[in-house]
Amino acid sequence: MRLLYLNPNATEAMTESMALVARKAAPEVEIVAWTNHLGPTAIQGAEDGDAAVEGLLSLLPKAKDAAVNAIIIGCFDDTGLRRIRAAAHCPVIGIGHAAMSLAALHGSRFGIVTSLDISVPVIAANVDLYGYRDACVGVFASGL
């Protein structure tokens, strides 16, 4: 299996760090990791997320040529997930959606802690979109 980890932001160090973690977690899987060099340096709220989408979409032909089996959007707010899913040649999941799905599978309620207040509305909207409103006790910013 060949998975593509797509970092929506333009920070190469973040891409490398997440790829390292993914490779350790799943050594039997080939992890390809790319940085969205057309995106902002960080995804902090809806405006940054919106600014990242075109760059992510521009990477999809390359992803198809690279014969990846699935794409992971490597930002908890699942930047551009719906548009990328609609345009991709393969399954696409965001790490936020994956985390919420896993938490819900365990059958207990869960909460989400993010770093900045500006990220709360985007993540809270995703909780609703994915159908986890009743399972999620809230989305909170740590201020870190």
Q: Can you say where each PLM-predicted feature lies in the sequence?
A:
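Glycine/small-residue-rich loop that forms an oxyanion/phosphate-binding "nest" at active or ligand-binding sites
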Residues: V53-S108, I112
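N-terminal glycine-rich anion-binding loop in soluble enzyme alpha/beta folds
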Residues: M1-G55, S115-L144
